Amino acid sequence: MNQERIYKVLLGPHVSEKASLAAERGQVVFRVAPDATKPEIKKAVEQLFNVTVEGVQVLNRKGKLKRTIRGFGKRNDIRKAYVKLAEGQDIDFLDVE
C-alpha cells in the first residue's frame, strides 16, 4: 500500500461516549474511507501510530433523513472502524507527527 493511500484510509478519530467506553477495553475508533478494507485499516494504523493491531471491526452507519424548513435532507453515511490494540499499547492523538 502506497503512502498516499495510508493517509486517505483514516479520516480521523471518532469521539463519542461509546468510543470512550471502547477505549477502556483497549480499542480505538476511527472514521474511515467508505472503500477502506480491514487489512488496509490495520496496515494504516500500524504504520502511522507504530502500534500492533490485533483486530479490526468495521461498521457502516446510514445517514438519517432529517426534516428541514425546505423539506427533507439526508445526513452523510459514515464508516467507522473499531481497532483493537495489543495489550499495553495506546495511541496518543496529541503526540502524532
From Swiss-Prot:
Pfam families: Ribosomal_L23 (PF00276). The keyword Acyltransferase does not apply. The gene is rplW. One of its GO terms (molecular function) is structural constituent of ribosome. One of the early assembly proteins it binds 23S rRNA. One of the proteins that surrounds the polypeptide exit tunnel on the outside of the ribosome. Forms the main docking site for trigger factor binding to the ribosome. Gene3D superfamilies: 3.30.70.330. One of its GO terms (cellular component) is ribonucleoprotein complex. This is Large ribosomal subunit protein uL23. The keyword Plastid does not apply. Belongs to the universal ribosomal protein uL23 family. It comes from the Bacteria. PANTHER family: 60S RIBOSOMAL PROTEIN L23A. InterPro entries: Nucleotide-bd_a/b_plait_sf, Ribosomal_uL23-like, Ribosomal_uL23/eL15/eS24_sf, Ribosomal_uL23_CS. Keywords: Ribonucleoprotein, Ribosomal protein, RNA-binding, rRNA-binding. Part of the 50S ribosomal subunit. Contacts protein L29, and trigger factor when it is bound to the ribosome. It comes from Marinobacter nauticus (strain ATCC 700491 / DSM 11845 / VT8).
